[in-house]
Design a protein with these regions (language model features):
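Conserved mixed alpha/beta core segments that line enzyme active sites in large multi-domain catalysts
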Residues: 1-293
């Protein structure tokens, strides 16, 4: 929608497509399409339509079928990295400008990212610039990830919903799959520092050091270029969802979705000379955000 964002309003179903009975696999796909289409009538969707003063009867929705990016590891299917990037950043810091954008990435399926869980945030133009301290990175790091459970084929999408085929796993599992290297570092409590020797015991901090600090793969520069191209093409700030997957020792970037970022601009002229600041409830010489309280 060009008028209002609808991301996350409707349902998304991921199916393993591995049942031995082909007819059952077709049935699962048909049920998933029906459930996505009917999700427009859920209480949460109706509440969103009421909030934006829109009518469900006027909605024209298409159901999209996409292949899930990833590989199978020991009965689990997931991509190495999932993320969301925006070309406008409402909360810049240091010398980062709002127009430099930002990205959030995590291990495993993108449901972890769009669900608002603990992700790693960075600016694609300045990926080495970090606001968090070493202790903050260890505390606020990703602790689990999502993958499609390929070992269970007798799921039921109707009663179990979007989580019918998705399971949460801890970081030890993804490390055993061989997919934590280049994506995490080890917090050394004794010396209060970050290390990269995975044979050392200690909490894993998912901060993608090799990728963002040492450009193991050009993820940050690729995002910076794409955000600039897409925002110019659309004539507005954009948001995109993406995945990065390692296939035969090659890292491949997948663009999953792109849409305009709805940003309302408010302009107000303020006469500072006639304002009694002694009576002001709140005053800030420097502020950031979307400009509204």
């Amino acid at each position: 929608s060009l008028g209002q964002p609808f991301a996350g309003v409707y349902s998304t179903y991921l199916i393993p497509n591995n049942h031995p009975d082909f007819e059952r696999r077709v049935e699962d796909l048909e049920n998933a399409v029906r459930l996505v289409w009917s999700s427009i009538y859920t209480d949460s969707s109706k509440a969103y339509f009421n909030a934006i003063d829109s009518m469900i009867e006027e909605e024209k929705m298409a159901v999209i079928i996409q292949e899930v990016i990833g590989n199978e590891y020991n009965g689990k299917y997931y991509p190495n990295i999932s993320g969301v990037a925006q070309s406008f950043n409402f909360y810049p810091f240091s010398y980062i400008k709002p127009e430099d954008g930002f990205a959030v990435i995590a291990l495993g399926l993108g449901a972890y990212v769009v669900g608002g869980e603990k992700t790693h945030r960075f600016c694609p133009r300045y990926p080495k610039l970090q606001l968090a301290s070493i202790q903050d990175m260890a505390r606020d790091s990703q602790k689990h990830f999502y993958a499609i459970d390929m070992t269970y084929s007798e799921y039921n999408l109707v009663p179990d919903g979007e989580q019918a085929t998705i399971k949460s796993y801890d970081l030890k599992t993804i490390e055993q799959d061989g997919n934590l290297q280049h994506c995490a570092s080890i917090f050394d409590y004794m010396n209060d520092r970050i290390g990269f020797d995975f044979s050392v015991r200690g909490p894993r901090s998912v901060n993608f050091p090799d990728i963002l600090q040492y450009d193991y793969i050009p993820l940050a520069s690729s995002l910076d270029i794409l955000l600039n191209i897409f925002s110019q093409a659309m004539g507005a700030p954009v948001e995109m969802e993406f995945a990065v997957n390692r296939e035969n020792d090659e890292w491949i970037f997948y663009l999953l979705q792109i849409k305009p970022l709805i940003k309302n601009d408010y302009h107000m002229d303020i006469d500072n000379e006639n304002i009694d600041f002694d009576k002001a409830i709140l005053r800030a010489d420097k502020g950031m955000g979307n400009g509204r309280l």
